[in-house]
Amino acid sequence: MEELICTYPYHSNLFMFLFLFFCPSKRARRGHPKFLFTLCYKSNHLIPKLLPPSLFTKRVMLNPSSHPPSPDFPTGSSASPRVKLRPSTLWAPPLTVSSDFAASSSSTAPVTVTDKPVTPAVSKRYQP
């Protein structure tokens, strides 16, 4: 099984070239051409020694289960050892259905819960 790892975005060199070429800089205000740094950047990256690594690095994994998880690509519970879930946060009380609701949902005819009209209770401090 081969694993392909993208080391950097494929458009990073082009984006950096365009960004440095079209964005004005403080050097441009002082009399330096704004594309000077861009040309230096591109000329440095044309030298083979300074070229970034290839876009995709092949890494052959014969048995993935025998390899420990990589810190660059954390998976599972080892992703962040500082984050620990407490059992109290995972527990929820069981849902219970009242007998009145169970009886009303089993019948097909609509059932009224109360015969009295319901009026909302308003506190006195909110009354004008």
UniProtKB/Swiss-Prot annotation:
Q: Which GO terms describe its cellular component?
A: cytoplasm; nucleus
Q: Region Disordered: which residues?
A: 62-83, 101-128
Q: Looking at the keywords, is Membrane present?
A: no
Low complexity: which segments have biased composition? 101-114
**What are the alphabetically sorted keywords of the record?**
Cytoplasm, Nucleus
Disulfide feature: none
Its domain of life reads Eukaryota
**Annotated compartments:** Cytoplasm; Nucleus
Give the misc comment.
Present with 300 molecules/cell in log phase SD medium.
Listed name of the protein: Uncharacterized protein YER084W
Question: What species does this protein belong to?
Answer: Saccharomyces cerevisiae (strain ATCC 204508 / S288c)
